[in-house]
Amino acid sequence: MAAPVDQVRTLYRTLLLYAAISLLILIAGLVEFVYFEPPGHHTGLRATIVGIYQYDPDQNAVTGPDSSLFPRTALFAAKVDWSSLPSNVVVDARWYDSFGNIVGGVGPATPPELADKTIIPVRVPPGFRHILPGHYLFVVERYEGGVPVEVIGRRLVQVER
C-alpha cells in the first residue's frame, strides 16, 4: 500500500516556487532600474517648459494661456526654452499618451541643435480627426551613451472626452 501524499509538503513547495519567481522578478526590476537610472547620474538640471498651449499647425505657433486641460478637438503643444540648458548635454522631448505610445517629440540632440524646435506638438493618430481622450505626459530627458538617463522636465495634460 502506498504512503499517503502529504498535502502540506506540496503547498510548501508551491509557495517556495512562487517566492523564487517573485525574487527573479524583483531582481529583473532592480537591474532595469539601475540600467535606466544609473547611480550618480543625477545632474540637477531642470528644463524650462514654458507651458502647454493650443497649437495652430498652419502657423506652427501656440496661442492662448498655459493649460493642463484640453478638449478632444483642440490641438496642443509644449513650448520649451532650450537656452536654459547647457549646450553640451544631449536631450530630447517626447509626448506620451495614456497607453505609453510616443505621440510627438524632438531629439535627441543638443540644445543649440534644438533651438529652432521650441514648439513640440502632439500628433493626431493616423486615421483620426481628433486627439484621443486621456492623460498625456510631456517629458524632457537627458541622454548619455544613447540612453535616456535623467528626466529633467515633465508636464501632465488631460484631454477631455
Language-model regions, residue ranges each:
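Short beta-strand elements
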Residues: W82, V147-R161
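Contiguous beta-strand segments within globular domains
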Residues: G51-S87
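Ser/Thr/Pro/Gly-rich low-complexity linker/stalk segments immediately outside membranes or between
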Residues: F33-G51
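Short, solvent-exposed, Trp/other aromatic-anchored flexible loops in extracytoplasmic proteins
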Residues: P111-L137, E144
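Hydrophobic membrane-insertion alpha-helices, especially the h-region
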Residues: T14-F33
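Conserved aromatic beta-strand anchor motif in extracellular beta-sandwich/beta-rich domains
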Residues: A93-D97, V140-R142
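Solvent-exposed serine/threonine-rich low-complexity stretches and specific carbohydrate-binding patches
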Residues: I102-A115, G153-L156
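N-terminal Lys/Arg-rich, disordered targeting/topogenic segments
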Residues: M1-Y12
